Amino acid sequence: TAPPDASKMGDWGVFPWLYNTDDATFAFLDDVLNEVMDIFPSTFIHIGGDEAIKDQWKASPKIQAKIKELELKDEHALQSWFIQRVGKTLEERGRRLIGWDEILEGGLAPNATVMSWRGIDGAIAAAKQGHDTVLSPHPVLYFDNRQSASAEEPTGRGHISSLKDVYAF
C-alpha cells in the first residue's frame, strides 16, 4: 500500500507534477529502489524519465534556487542531476539505470542505458555518446497494444501492432 501522499491518482497519462529535489524525496526513492532491487535480480532497473513537464519546476522559486545552487543551466539539467542521483543508488547495488530517451536532454549518467520510444534518433544519439540503447519505438514495438482487430483479441491500448508490423520494423 502506498502512503497517502504517494497514492495512485485513478488515471494514467502525462501529469505536470515532478518530484521535489529535497533529501526526503531521495530517501523515499532510495527505499523504494532498494526494495525493488531486493525483489528483482535484474541488472537493469528502469526508472522512467519520460514526459517530465518542467512547468512546475520553472514556476517554483525553491527549484530555481536549487538550479542556481547546483550551477545548472536549466530544468533539463536538473532532471539530469536528479536521474544521476537516482543512478548512484542503483550503482551502489551493482545495478544499471535504464530510462526513456528523454533522459538524453540535459546530459546522461555515465552508465545509463537509453530506451528510445520516440523513434531511432534517441538511440543513435545515445550510442554516439557511448551508451547502450534499446529500441522500443511507439507504436510498433508497444506490446501492450492490441495485436489484431479480432473479437478474441484481449483488450489492449492504442493502435494495433500486428506481427507483420513488428517484423517489418
Which residues are covered by each model-predicted region?
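Substrate-binding groove of N-acetylhexosamine-processing glycoside hydrolases
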Residues: 22-44, 51, 65-169
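Aromatic- and acidic-residue-enriched carbohydrate-binding clefts of CAZyme catalytic domains
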Residues: 1-24, 55-76
